[in-house]
Design a protein with these regions (language model features):
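Long amphipathic N-terminal alpha/beta scaffold segment
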Residues: 66-94
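Active-site beta-strand-loop-beta-strand hairpin of nuclease catalytic cores
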Residues: 90-107
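Extended hydrophobic/Leu-rich segments
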Residues: 36, 73-80, 108, 182
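Catalytic cores of nucleic-acid endonucleases
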Residues: 104-169
Length: 189
C-alpha cells in the first residue's frame, strides 16, 4: 500500500471548500483573483468527489450483476482508493479475471440533452481509447478486456439522451440493459 487514500484526500479538500464558501462575496464581480482560483479548485474537488462516487457505484453494479465476485470487488475497490484523482490511464484498470477497463464520465450536457462540442469530443476520444487502447495507460491492447463507459445519470434522463446521440449506430458500442451477455468486443455504456 502506498499510504495514499483518495477518500481522505477528497474529504480534506471538500472540508476546506465548505469552510471557504461562506466567505465569498455575493456578487461574482467582487471576487478577487485568489477567490476565483479557490472556486476553480473547489469545482475540481467536487468533480473528483462525484467521479469517485460514480466509480464506486459502478463497482457495486459489477458485483450485483455478477460480473465480478467478492474477491475482484475488494481488489478493484482498493485500487480505486489508492489511485489519485486525474491519474493517467483508465478510471478502472483491472487485470484479474475478468479483465475490466472503464472510463467514468460525469458530464452534464450543456444543452439540456446534447453535449457541447468539447464534451462530445472528450467522450468520443474515451470511447475510442476503450476500443483501441490508450497511450497514457499501461494497457495498450484492450482486446481481452470487458470495456465500460460509465456515465452519470440524472433524474430528467438528459445524460442518457445525450449519450444516445453520440453512440447511435456506433460500431462496437452498446447500451447495457442487463439482458445481454457481456463480451470483450464491445464497449458498454
Amino acid at each position: 500500500m502506498n499510504g495514499y487514500s483518495k477518500k481522505e484526500y477528497l474529504k480534506t479538500s471538500y472540508e476546506e471548500i465548505r469552510k471557504g464558501v461562506a466567505k465569498l462575496p455575493k456578487d461574482y464581480k467582487q471576487l478577487t483573483w485568489e477567490e476565483i482560483t479557490a472556486l476553480k479548485k473547489a469545482v475540481s474537488t467536487v468533480n473528483n468527489v462525484i467521479t469517485l462516487s460514480v466509480t464506486e457505484l459502478f463497482v457495486d453494479f459489477l458485483k450485483n450483476e455478477n460480473i465480478i465476485g467478492e474477491e475482484q470487488y475488494q481488489e478493484i475497490k482498493k485500487q480505486i482508493e489508492n489511485t489519485k484523482p486525474n491519474a493517467n490511464g483508465y478510471d478502472i484498470e483491472y487485470n484479474g479475471n475478468p479483465k475490466i477497463i472503464a472510463e467514468v464520465k460525469c458530464n452534464i450536457p450543456v444543452n439540456e440533452d446534447s453535449f457541447g462540442a468539447a464534451q462530445r469530443t472528450g467522450i468520443i476520444e474515451d470511447l475510442e481509447s476503450l476500443q483501441n487502447g490508450k497511450g497514457k495507460s499501461c494497457i495498450t491492447n484492450t482486446e481481452d478486456y470487458y470495456k465500460f463507459m460509465v456515465v452519470l445519470s440524472d433524474k430528467e434522463g438528459n445524460v442518457k439522451k445525450a449519450m444516445r446521440k453520440i453512440i447511435n449506430g456506433g460500431d462496437g458500442i452498446e447500451e447495457y440493459n442487463g439482458k445481454i451477455t457481456i463480451t470483450t468486443d464491445k464497449v458498454y455504456i
